[in-house]
Amino acid sequence: EVWRANFRTNCACAGAIELAIHRDFDGTHLKDGCAKSVIDQYGYKRVGFVLANTLQMQSYDGRYHETNKRWSRTIFVPEDGGHRHTFLINSHPAILDGFVSNYRAELAKLHLFGAEHCEPNSGEQDFTGRVLVLSPDTLRESCWQPENQLWLASGGFGCRPHARGRSVFCTCLGDGETTRWNRSEFVGIIRDECIPDWAAEKLAELRQSQNAPAMGEMTM
C-alpha cells in the first residue's frame, strides 16, 4: 500500500510539472517560479526524483543539456518492474530541459553541501576527528539547511572504512546536538577550504573543549 501511494504521488507530480510548463511557457521561455510552484506542492526530493526519471529514460535525446543529464544520473531511480514509464513527463524535451535548470537553480539557493565539497577519496578514509557532510536525503526537507549537514565525528566502528560496524558518533556543528548516524548516510569528508566561517568557529570550540582537562585534573 505504501508503494502504491508513493507511485500515485509520482504520477501526480509528473502531471503537475506538465501543467506548470503549459501554464508558464509563453512560447519563448518559462516564467520565473515555474519549478518552485511544483516544489511547494510536492517537495524537492519528489520533484527531483520525477525529473531524473524522465531524463534517465530519455538520455538519448540531445535536446536535454549534458549538465542536466549528468545531474539526473546522481539520483537513483530503481527499475521497478517497468513502472517508471508511467510517470514520464510528456512535455517537449527542450522546454522540460529549461524546467530542470529552473529546478536546479531553486535547489542551489539552499546552499546545501554535496559531493563536490568533499574530499574525492572520502570513502577510503577514517572519519574520526573529521568534519563530515550529512546527505540531504537523510534529513527531512524542513531541515534542509547547511547548518544541519556538518558533523564532527568522534568515534564509532563506522568511522573505519572497511569495518563491519556502521555507527558513527558525532556532533552537529550547527546546534551542538550529539547523535549517531550510519557511515552510509554521509556524503564524505568536507574539504577544508569548503568549511564556512561559522562552522570553523564551532569546530575550534569543540576541539578546544575536547582537549581541555577535566575538572580536578592536575595540569603541569
Residue ranges and their predicted role:
Residues 1-219:
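Gram-negative host-targeted secretion-system effectors, predominantly Type III and Type IV
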